[in-house]
Each structure stands twice: as structure tokens, then as C-alpha cells.
């Protein structure tokens, strides 16, 4: 059959990698174990190379390794990758990857990724669209440092390169069934084989579901579901491999995923003084949130969340791709075409105050969510001569990003706002009170007496709040719609010159043209904005109605009260506001590397790389004071990276030991931060990340025993900067802890280790185990570095025991993740409207910051890491 040699040529390396990297994590791995580390093949430079010949820091993980460590989605991948953190926040759509301390929170759809995700050659423009059950994997390669030359923009911190299993002409059918705690159930079915002499197919279908990781106190309702962070999704992937000749290969892929889950609640880690107001509004349906105690309060890892509104999320992801390769013997080259179309959409409902009181929420009615659709095309021509490996390429993409956003007032919003406005007033004059909002918005003005110049007269009791005073009507407050269209074209080349038998030089360049256009409509609904309008009018003496009450003075609504009444969702200046912005940009990025092979066992290299992350727009209501920002634009980010590395092969080529020093400087680092009312990208002038990566793989002399480990030391810090260095100096107080400080999500030390064992038990049986762990030193989980968001050092351990037949017909795995029940926080954040971390934003502290922990009144919440899970998996294959 004419396809045989061609097919073997394209699949042998994948099979070897599947068995080689990190060793005997499963039955199949044991039977295909390599003789040495030389057999570990990667495509980090878009051509097959031995891992030890590539002058890049690459962690390569096979399907067996991923199974052995209990990896089901890319979030779990971090247990095998030192120096990498993956977090989710408001939803599974808000997933962010960081490498060597570089990366940003993913809750802003206008913000593109720092770590690129590529699946079967197709670039995913947002981290969130690349996460889920990826089915049958050949391997995953994690490339550290900027990779823009070959992988394009938005890979300034690294790339996760995912390669799935190709169709096979050898027919097989496999199935898997899993059951575990938290009501986990799931299964998958896969089949591959020939459809004709030149066509092979593969299909994979999986469904997984699980109860929630959180218990929910529903407070005032209307929510009835008492659990959250559930799992429920279907996914499918179909492929065709067409080999019309020995020179031509075509691979077609179609995939579809649908998720229908409840996510993501958070728990209180520290409760501020507003808890008393929450409790009063939530009564008699519970405390509304965890009652306060000294310090941080009770341990939040009972996983009890408070949410009176439902948190449903629906994600739909689909795509098509076509990869065609044509061998050109006359040029000793290969032409590759990669075409893709993808459509991803997300909708959710959300309890925005994270309490049992009915204050603020997002409705699950189609008015909250976003979508991304894109079309990409890449052409590459790669070849080789005796002295040169060369590659030239063209990449083009068109992308649309759409966001719908709305807020709704709950029945308790008026009362809570009144509590906040009267919080400092003693009970003798009627405060704090849930029914005094009109004192601050009444058209007659803000009336006080000489005896009580800071107390509105209606709070004292002489005048009742006017019935005509505008307040906040329960129901939807606003609906905003954003549409961003972007186009990007790039020309690139990557070439290696073998100067001598031992010395290579590599030069890569990429020219990128980027353009984006943003259209938006911001619209308040009904009478929303009237309360703010009344407060603003009362500040103007010309607008204040004269008072007929003797002894009163009309002083206008205080600025602090106006700030609370004119938050972005209640500000009339957004009503019927139209947004239209556009930009175009060009950038030249590239890399220059030199490598020297001292002998067969030792290779050293030095490299420089420049990365580029595109500019964009904040798709949110962003204001300074009460004035909406005139532009939502934020600048592009660049990085210059230097590396010195050595790759060694030891002990008769049974051990791999690699060591790399890195020095990276990011300019205009795109920091996405939550300001309490909106997610905003602010460009930080400079972030440096320096440190060392070390990786080891060892096929031990003990039959069936293998060890893999990695260590990353990272010193990631912001440079010193002032308010004048920011695009909006008014944001400096909230970011004043950053200058000179360690970056968030950047542990100084990150260590991983995996021990795998597999061998014959006799009687036609094989058995083995896999134990993997990751240790991280302490780091901060918030973009503003507030101390209540600190995470202490922690260790996560996963394990798996496997028994099965020698011929792989069946295997049974007993597995556990987070076996030590380690309790840790993914992301910490300050609850909206519930106190403030920055009580003084006009006068800095002696240390130059605007933060004083003694005056911090904020309530803090956290999205927690997954608890201990365990289960059993049965696999069969024919």
C-alpha cells in the first residue's frame, strides 16, 4: 500500500515521544520505552528536532505522562511544568496562563494572551478558548520565553503547543469510563482506522459531569441551587488523514464542545465592617456572608459560598482546520498550508456582590457574555541544504470579538447604598440606615444645620426623604454592546546556518501588521442614572432648590457620596454613549541564537529574542472620577529576552539535564487589574523577570522506573514608577504597591517532580504507579499586590496506580489529585462595594504607597484551588 512509508514517517516520532518523556506512566508507555533521551523529539521550531538540539527551554509531556499526573485540562498541566501558573476566576472563560511571572488576569475580552495556545498548528487567540478536554493527545510542548518569530504575536511569555493523535491506518477502538467523588462521572469513546486505501479517520467523543466543589448559602434567593463550580460538558473531534501520494498529506479536523455548568462562586477570606449591613439586608435568610471574626476570620476552605443569584455559564466552541503538506524533492523542501476557522461563545449569569443579599447581579438572559470568531491562514516553505535549514512563511488572520454586558440592581441595592452613605453616622441621628438614600439625591439639595454640618437634615429627622428623590429601581440598569474587528498579517523567516560541525547560528525575523476597530454602544435603561444626576445637580448651587426650612443650609451633596451614587453602572454620562476607535500598528520581532556542541553529550547556547503583544481596547465602563474615559485604548507590549543555556546527556544517554539562565524585560507590560468597578488594562512601564530553569529526565537502571523533575527560580519585579508614568495617573493610588515589588503570581521557587514505575507482574498482567508533585513558594494572587491576597507556600501531590493486561486490552487506574488536601487560593480579590483598601488616595504613606493595612476596610474573597478528588478509571482497547 502506497501510504505505508509516508504514514510511518509522520507517526513514529509521536509514538516515541509518547513513550519517552517522563517514562513509564502507563502500560503503553512501558512497551514503547526508548533506549535513550535522544529519542525525545519536539517541533518547537516547526520542524522535527531532538529536544537536546533545540536552543529553547522546552518541557515536553506525552499523553501517558498527562494521564499519569491526572491531567484532564490545561489547568492541571501546571503540576508538571515549573515556573507556570494557570488560574480561573469569574468563569471557566477567564482562564489565564503565566510563565516566569509574566501574564495577566483574563477577565477582559479586549486583552489578548501573553502565553499563546496552539492546537494542531492552529493559534487560539484567547487562553480561554484553548482549555477543555482535548481528547487523545500525542504530546504537549511548553515553550518558555518569547516565541513570536514562529508562533506570532501574543506569545511574549511563551507557548503551549498541543499536538493531538492523528488518524491511523491500523484500526482500533477504545473506550474509557471514570467515576469519582463529588459525583464525578465521565466517559469517552474513540475509533480510528482506514476508510480507503488513502484515507484514514479518527473520531473521539467524551462526556463528563461532576457536582460542585462549593456549598452555597442562597440567602434572599431567588437562587435555589445549593452547590457551585459544577462540571457538565460534551466534546467531540473528528479527523481525516488523506495521503493521495507519497509527496502529499492532508489532515482535516472538526471539533465541537458544549459546556453547561454553574461557575464560579468565591468564598470570603476576610470580612470587613459592611458585613453588618449585608446581614441586616439578608435577614431572616441567613447572615448573607461569613460572619466576621478577628484577623482573617474562619478558614474559608469549608468551601461555603454566599450567592442569592444563580451563576450559570454556557460555553460553545467549534472549529474546522485543514493542514496540507507537499514535499518538493527538487528543492529538498516542504510546503505547508494551515487553514482554520473557529467560533467560540460564552454566556453567564453572575452574583456580582458574592453575598446572600440581593444587591447587584448579571442576568442569565443572553445580555452577558462574549464571543470570538476568527479565520486564519498560514503558509510555510521549509527546506535544508548541507549548511542551512531555512524557513519562510506568511500568516494572516481576521478576527471578531463581541461583548454584551449588563448589570441589574437587586431589591437590596437601595438599602445597601443608603447603609454605606450613612455608615459613619451615630444611631442618635438616624444612621446607619437603609432608608435614607433620598437625603443625598433630593432635588431640594443637601440640607444641613449649623449644629450638624456633616449630617443631612432628613437623617436627623426634621425632614423625611422626599418621595420625589430618585433612587435605584430594582431591575436591569444598563446594557452595553461592543464589537471589535481586527486584521493581522505577518511575514516571517527562521534560518539555521551550520557554521562548523559543532557551531550553529540561528536568525529569525517577523514583520507584523496589526489593525483593530472598536465599535460600542453604552446605554442606561429606564430611570437608571437619575440618582447620580440628582447628586451631581445638588453640587451646583444654581441647581439647588431653595429651602423654606429655617436654620438650614444647602451645601450640596458631598463628593464622597457622589462617588458612590455615580459608579459606572449608575452614571448618566454613559447613557446612549457611542464608541468608535481604531488603530493600526507594525512591529518587527525576531531571535538570534548561537549554539555550540562540545561533544555528543554537551551543547551550550546563547540567545536573544524579541516578543510583541498587540495593543487593544478595554471593553468595559471605565471612568476617572465620574467622567467616562475618552478612549479605551491601551498600548502594545514588547519584551526583550536573553538566555544562556546548557543541555547535557549523561550516564550512557539515560539522563537529560538542562540548565538555562534567563533575563527578560517587558515594556508597557499590560496589567489587567480590577478597580472595584471594572477590569482595566494599565500599561506598567517595565517588568523584569530573571532566573534559572532546570529540567531533568532520568531512565534509571531499575527496570521500569523513571524520574522527571524541574526547578525554576524567578525574580520577577516591577520597576520603580510614578503616577506620571501611567496612561491614567489617577490609577496610581490603587497600583502604588507595585513599584519595585515582586510581580503577582511569580513564586520565587517552583519545583516539580514525577516518579513513574511500570513492569510485568506475570500471568499476562502489568502494573505500575505514578506520583507527581509541585511545590511553589509564596506569592501574591492579586494584580494590586494587597497583602490580604497573599498565598503561602504550598505543595500539590497527585498519584495513580495502574493494573492491566500485557496486551493493553484493559487497564484499571485508581487515582487521586491533591492527595494531601492542600488548601490554596487561585486568585484573591476585594468584594465590590464592601469597604475599601485605599481610604486615602490624596496623601501617600511614608513609604510612598497609598495603602495602610490598619485602615483597610475591604471584604476579601477568593477563588480556591480544587480540593482532593479521587476515583477509578477503566479503559478498554481493541
Which positions does each model-derived feature cover?
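Periplasmic-side early beta-strands and strand-to-turn transitions of outer-membrane beta-barrels
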Residues: 161, 168-170, 178, 192-290, ...
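Outer-membrane beta-barrel translocator/receptor signature
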Residues: 95, 112-114, 126, 135-144, ...
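Structural signature of Gram-negative outer-membrane beta-barrels, strongest in the C-terminal barrel
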Residues: 241-245, 381-382, 393-397, 482-664
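Acidic, small-polar-rich N-terminal luminal/periplasmic segments of exported/outer-membrane proteins
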Residues: 37-170, 644
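C-terminal beta-signal and adjacent terminal beta-strands/loops
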Residues: 400-401, 407-414, 706, 774-782, ...
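N-terminal Sec signal peptide and the immediately downstream disordered periplasmic leader
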Residues: 1-69, 75-81, 246, 320, ...
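Gram-negative outer-membrane beta-barrel transporters
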Residues: 389, 501-505, 654-666, 683-783, ...
Amino acid at each position: 500500500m502506497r501510504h505505508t512509508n509516508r504514514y510511518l514517517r509522520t507517526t513514529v516520532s509521536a509514538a516515541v515521544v509518547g513513550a519517552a518523556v517522563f517514562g513509564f506512566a502507563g502500560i503503553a508507555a512501558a512497551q514503547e520505552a526508548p533506549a535513550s533521551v535522544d529519542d525525545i523529539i519536539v517541533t518547537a521550531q516547526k520542524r522535527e528536532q531532538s529536544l537536546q538540539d533545540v536552543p529553547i527551554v522546552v518541557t515536553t509531556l506525552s499523553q501517558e505522562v498527562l494521564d499519569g499526573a491526572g491531567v484532564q485540562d490545561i489547568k492541571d498541566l501546571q503540576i508538571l511544568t515549573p515556573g507556570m501558573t494557570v488560574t480561573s476566576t469569574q468563569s471557566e472563560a477567564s482562564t489565564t496562563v503565566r510563565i516566569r511571572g509574566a501574564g495577566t488576569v483574563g477577565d477582559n475580552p479586549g486583552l489578548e494572551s501573553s502565553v499563546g495556545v496552539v492546537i494542531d498548528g492552529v493559534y487560539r487567540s484567547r487562553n480561554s478558548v484553548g482549555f477543555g478536554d482535548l481528547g487523545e493527545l500525542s504530546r504537549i510542548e511548553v515553550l518558555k520565553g518569547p516565541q513570536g518569530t514562529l508562533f506570532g504575536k501574543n506569545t511574549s511569555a511563551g507557548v503551549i503547543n498541543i499536538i493531538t493523535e492523528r488518524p491511523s491506518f491500523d484500526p482500533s477502538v477504545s473506550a474509557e469510563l471514570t467515576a469519582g467523588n463529588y459525583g464525578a462521572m465521565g466517559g469517552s469513546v474513540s475509533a480510528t482506522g482506514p476508510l480507503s486505501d488513502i484515507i484514514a479517520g479518527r473520531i473521539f467523543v467524551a462526556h463528563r459531569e461532576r457536582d460542585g466543589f462549593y456549598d452555597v448559602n442562597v440567602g434572599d434567593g431567588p437562587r435555589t441551587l445549593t452547590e457551585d463550580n459544577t462540571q457538565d460538558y460534551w466534546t467531540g473531534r473528528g479527523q481525516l488523514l488523506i495521503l493521495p501520494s507519497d509527496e502529499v498529506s492532508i489532515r482535516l479536523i472538526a471539533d465541537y464542545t458544549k459546556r453547561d455548568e454553574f461557575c464560579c462562586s468565591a468564598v470570603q477570606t476576610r470580612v470587613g465592617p459592611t458585613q453588618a449591613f449585608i446581614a441586616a439586608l439578608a435577614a431572616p435568610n441567613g447572615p448573607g456572608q461569613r460572619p466576621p471574626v478577628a484577623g482573617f476570620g474562619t478558614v474559608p476552605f469549608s468551601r461555603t459560598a454566599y450567592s442569592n443569584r444563580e451563576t450559570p455559564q454556557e460555553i460553545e466552541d467549534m472549529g474546522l482546520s485543514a493542514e496540507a503538506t507537499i514535499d518538493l524533492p527538487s528543492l529538498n523542501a516542504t510546503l505547508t498550508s494551515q487553514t482554520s476557522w473557529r467560533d467560540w461563545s460564552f454566556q453567564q449569569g453572575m452574583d456580582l456582590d458574592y453575598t446572600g443579599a440581593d444587591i447587584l447581579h448579571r442576568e442569565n438572559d443572553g445580555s452577558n457574555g462574549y464571543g470570538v470568531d476568527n479565520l486564519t491562514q498560514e503558509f510555510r516553505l521549509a527546506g535544508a541544504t548541507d549548511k542551512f535549514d531555512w524557513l519562510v512563511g506568511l500568516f494572516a488572520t481576521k478576527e471578531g470579538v463581541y461583548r454584551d454586558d449588563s448589570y441589574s440592581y437587586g431589591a437590596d441595592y437601595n438599602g445597601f447604598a443608603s447603609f454605606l452613605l450613612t455608615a459613619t453616622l451615630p444611631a442618635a441621628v438616624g444612621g446607619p440606615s437603609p432608608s435614607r438614600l433620598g437625603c443625598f439625591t433630593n432635588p431640594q439639595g443637601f440640607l444641613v444645620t449649623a449644629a450638624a454640618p456633616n449630617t443631612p437634615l432628613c437623617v436627623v429627622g426634621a425632614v423625611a426623604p422626599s418621595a420625589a428623590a430618585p433612587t435605584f429601581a430594582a431591575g436591569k440598569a444598563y446594557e452595553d454592546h461592543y464589537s471589535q474587528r481586527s486584521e493581522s498579517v505577518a511575514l516571517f523567516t527562521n534560518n539555521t546556518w551550520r557554521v562548523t560541525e559543532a557551531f550553529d547560528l540561528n536568525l529569525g525575523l517577523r514583520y507584523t501588521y496589526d489593525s483593530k476597530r472598536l465599535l460600542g454602544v453604552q446605554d442606561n435603561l429606564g430611570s437608571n442614572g437619575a440618582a447620580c444626576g440628582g447628586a451631581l445637580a445638588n453640587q451646583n448651587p444654581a441647581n439647588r432648590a431653595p429651602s423654606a426650612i429655617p436654620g438650614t443650609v444647602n451645601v450640596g451633596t458631598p463628593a464622597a457620596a457622589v462617588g458612590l451614587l455615580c459608579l459606572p453602572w449608575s452614571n448618566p454620562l454613559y447613557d446612549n454613549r457611542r464608541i468608535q476607535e481604531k488603530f493600526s500598528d507594525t512591529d518587527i520581532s525576531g531571535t538570534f541564537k548561537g549554539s555550540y556542541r562540545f561533544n555528543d553529550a554537551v551543547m551550550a547556547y546563547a540567545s536573544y529574542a524579541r516578543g510583541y503583544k498587540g495593543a487593544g481596547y478595554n471593553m468595559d465602563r471605565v471612568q476617572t472620577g465620574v467622567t467616562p474615559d475618552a478612549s479605551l485604548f491601551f498600548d502594545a507590549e514588547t519584551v526583550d529576552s536573553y538566555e544562556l543555556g546548557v543541555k547535557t546527556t549523561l550516564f550512557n544517554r539515560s539522563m537529560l539535564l538542562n540548565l538555562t539562565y534567563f533575563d527578560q524585560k517587558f515594556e508597557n507590560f499590560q496589567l489587567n487589574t480590577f478597580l472595584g468597578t471594572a477590569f482595566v488594562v494599565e500599561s506598567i512601564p517595565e517588568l523584569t523577570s530573571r532566573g534559572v530553569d532546570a529540567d531533568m529526565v532520568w531512565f534509571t537502571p531499575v527496570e521500569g522506573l523513571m524520574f522527571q523533575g524541574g526547578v525554576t527560580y524567578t525574580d520577577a519585579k516591577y520597576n520603580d514608577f510614578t503616577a506620571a508614568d501611567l496612561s491614567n495617573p489617577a490609577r496610581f493610588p490603587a497600583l502604588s504597591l507595585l513599584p519595585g515589588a515582586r510581580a503577582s503570581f511569580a513564586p520565587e521557587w517552583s519545583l516539580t517532580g514525577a516518579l513513574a514505575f511500570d513492569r510485568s507482574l506475570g500471568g499476562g498482567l502489568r502494573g505500575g504507579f505514578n506520583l507527581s508533585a509541585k511545590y511553589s513558594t509564596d506569592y501574591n494572587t492579586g494584580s494590586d499586590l494587597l497583602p490580604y491576597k497573599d498565598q503561602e507556600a504550598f505543595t500539590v501531590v497527585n498519584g495513580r496506580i495502574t493494573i492491566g493486561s500485557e496486551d493493553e486490552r484493559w487497564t484499571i487506574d485508581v487515582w487521586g489529585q491533591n492527595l494531601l488536601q492542600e488548601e490554596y487560593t487561585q486568585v484573591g480579590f476585594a468584594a465590590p462595594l464592601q469597604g475599601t483598601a485605599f481610604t486615602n488616595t490624596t496623601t501617600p504613606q511614608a513609604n510612598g504607597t497609598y495603602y495602610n493595612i490598619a485602615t483597610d476596610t475591604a471584604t476579601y474573597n477568593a477563588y480556591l484551588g480544587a480540593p482532593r478528588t479521587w476515583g477509578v478509571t477503566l479503559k478498554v482497547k481493541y
